[in-house]
Amino acid sequence: VSNEDSAAGPTGKLRTQALVHLSAFLASAGVFISLDNWALATGAGVPTLLAILAGLLAGFFMSHIFHEWGHFFGARLAGAATTIKAQPAPLFFDFDYAGSTARQTLALSAGGPLGNVLVIVLTLYSLPVVSPGRAALLAGMVGSLVFVLFLELPVTRRIRSGEAPIDAMMGHFGQGKPLFRRCTRLGVAAGAATFLTLLVL
């Protein structure tokens, strides 16, 4: 098997996606940590503002990466078939809702939010909240968690009530843009509340 054929296979595609996502994760974390350290060292307004903005963005990007890989591992641990995309992408794999069992789809669904929770726990463990930037980082992560919970949990409830996975997906996400706007507002509200609470504590 040639190197080109190996790279084009499922394992090669997964390796490529993992490296790209890891690079994006480390870049987001690195930019934030640099700006946060600058803000902590100077206490000046501009570095602090930049650290807050970087924290919010990094919280979102890092949460998204953990969320998608949580979905992936949930599906794979349940024995579901997944198709890895050839080109690097934020949503890096496809899941066959029509051909998967309810148990497999529920495992997929549970894995995503668990990934969000995991990155929050790891961040709390490794970065004490001693700056507005770090408060913003956690706020971005909490906001992302609330967004995905309101966006995805209704599908889980429909499947648990006996609806076929593909019907549950189509029925819920068929609401279109109003659904995403509503979940975005809830996520932003949760993130803002988290940020203000951490600043006061």
For every predicted segment, state its role.
Residues 2-201:
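Hydrophobic transmembrane alpha-helices and their immediate loop junctions
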